[in-house]
């Protein structure tokens, strides 16, 4: 038939035309997807071009070995530090903020504390050395104190023992007294103090105590002042110098002259010698 739609030719198979139409439709769809992809890509490039630039800080360029004490990479290598800095510079994108930079260690923002490390044996040696110095100082102080005490003791022994407080008894008196020899510097003051102790106070005595105070040292008086030395011997007071008397006296006794006559005759020559020596001086 001449009118109407022309049918397939005799040489063409019946499904060839339909396949050709499907190929044209698929190629058209691919072209549309390609155009869509190109347009989206150009938009992303424009957004990246208009995005603000971020300045890298020291935290971004910090070496990876310094962030982790257990890392096997040495922080002293300049090549490793440069590589780590380059990776950190290229890693964050334009959309990331400085506070959201990824880190491989939770303590990446802190430096290594206690670097360089001190070995344990060095720390122990320093501690032991300080301890030895302290002990030596204490030993020297103790030795100095002991030497000072020993010196004081030797000086005291050289000067002689000071009697201090000694007992005083008087014939006819039941109760004794004590007197401090360190409070006196001569026999006269000692005799006056003993007379005031054992004699009842009266107006006449107070008026004439300067004259009566020497009676204890006089052989013609009613009472005589005697003392017992360290050897246990009884002697008359006034035979030896005052310093020797103070260092050797053990106790005092006010004896009656009749009882002390033996002591007076025994040491009569000594009294005469002392009296002549005092007269010459």
UniProtKB/Swiss-Prot annotation:
Region (Disordered): 1-115, 130-157
Residue ranges with Basic and acidic residues bias: 133-157
Placement of sequence motif EAR-like (transcriptional repression): 36-40
Domain PB1: from-to ranges: 163-259
Record's compositionally biased regions (Low complexity): 7-17, 36-49, 63-84
Coiled-coil region list: none
Xref: PROSITE patterns: PB1
Keywords for the protein's UniProt record, in alphabetical order: Auxin signaling pathway, Nucleus, Repressor, Transcription, Transcription regulation
PANTHER family on file: AUXIN-RESPONSIVE PROTEIN IAA11, AUXIN-RESPONSIVE PROTEIN IAA17
Function description: Aux/IAA proteins are short-lived transcriptional factors that function as repressors of early auxin response genes at low auxin concentrations.
Subunit-level organization: Homodimers and heterodimers.
UniProt-recorded name of the protein: Auxin-responsive protein IAA10
Gene this protein is translated from: IAA10
């Amino acid at each position: 038939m001449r009118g109407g739609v022309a049918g397939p030719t005799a040489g063409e198979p019946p499904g060839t035309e339909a396949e050709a139409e499907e190929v044209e439709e698929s190629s058209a769809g691919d072209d549309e997807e390609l155009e869509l992809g190109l347009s989206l890509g150009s938009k992303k490039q424009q957004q990246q071009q208009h995005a603000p630039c971020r300045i890298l800080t020291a935290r971004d360029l910090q070496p990876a070995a310094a962030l982790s004490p257990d890392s096997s990479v040495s922080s002293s290598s300049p090549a490793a530090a440069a590589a780590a800095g380059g990776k950190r510079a290229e890693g964050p994108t334009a959309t990331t903020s400085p506070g959201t930079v990824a880190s491989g260690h939770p303590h990446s923002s802190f430096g290594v504390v206690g670097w360089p490390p001190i070995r344990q044996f060095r720390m122990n040696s320093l501690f032991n050395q300080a301890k030895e110095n302290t002990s030596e100082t204490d030993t020297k102080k103790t030795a100095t104190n002991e030497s000072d005490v020993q010196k004081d003791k030797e000086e005291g022994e050289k000067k002689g023992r000071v009697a201090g407080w000694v007992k005083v008894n008087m014939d006819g008196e039941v109760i004794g007294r004590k007197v401090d020899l360190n409070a006196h510097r001569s026999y006269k003051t000692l005799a006056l103090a003993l007379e005031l102790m054992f004699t009842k106070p009266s107006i006449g005595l107070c008026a004439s105590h300067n004259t009566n105070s020497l009676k204890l040292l006089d052989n013609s008086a009613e009472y005589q002042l005697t003392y017992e030395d360290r050897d246990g011997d009884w002697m008359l007071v006034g035979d030896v110098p005052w310093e020797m008397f103070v260092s050797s006296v053990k106790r005092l006794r006010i004896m009656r002259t009749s009882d002390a006559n033996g002591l007076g005759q025994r040491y009569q020559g000594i009294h005469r010698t002392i009296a002549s020596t005092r007269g010459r001086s």
